Amino acid sequence: LNANLGRYLGMTRGTDKEFLKIKDMLTHQSGLKAWIPFYKETLPYIDSVYCAKSDSAFCVKVADKLFMLKANKDTIYKRIFDSPLESRTYRYSDLSMILMQLVVEKISGVSLDTFMQDSFYSPMGLKDIGYNPWKHHDINNIAPTQVDRLFRKQELCGYVHDPAAAMLGGVSGHAGLFSTVQDLGFLMQMLADGGVYEGKRYLKLETIQKFTSYQRSDSRRGLGFDKPDFSGKTS
């Protein structure tokens, strides 16, 4: 938790992101911007960044019959690394969670969706939680996410509503996870039971306690977890 981001992501070396602490990123106090409107930056060049048909270059599916140039994913990461750091006070940041996905993938050696599927969802018997449900489920059983009138210009069903997550292939650390209430409930029950589900341990109790505890007196955040305000207010 006290390691620098550069320990895991070589691409940050030589930038001011190299020395960001993992703990500060998980508590949203690293100084990273709240978000960057990546999709808006592509709209002036829409014909060169998006295509209605998939090929080796345009293979990142952001919506039905809409594919993004694969190379644009690198542009997203570069924009994050080049963005100025701001105040280290608490402010939720999509960018922190986007980079945390890369950390998980570096450590595990597999993509975030594969890691979660193999480590939790499949062994727990959860069949209706995961990323990009349009790939694995009947679209008629998925509630539409939104009508996107600005970016993808269609009703989204089975595709993440967050534009940045869509541009990252529907799998991101900050958005993209779909679930039924039942499967989400089973996952939360595992956490409530100290990391055990149906007799099998998935997480250490001390890990859950550490990550779900307040970390600083000036922020309600745990490590990756949001928590009630110190005043007791929940909204």
Map each language-model feature to its residues.
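Short, glycine/proline-biased beta-turn/loop segments that scaffold the active-site neighborhood
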Residues: N2-T15, P123-M124
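Short, surface-exposed loop or secondary-structure junction motifs
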Residues: T15-S235
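Glycine-centered small-residue hotspots that permit tight backbone geometry or close packing
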Residues: L1-N2, G158
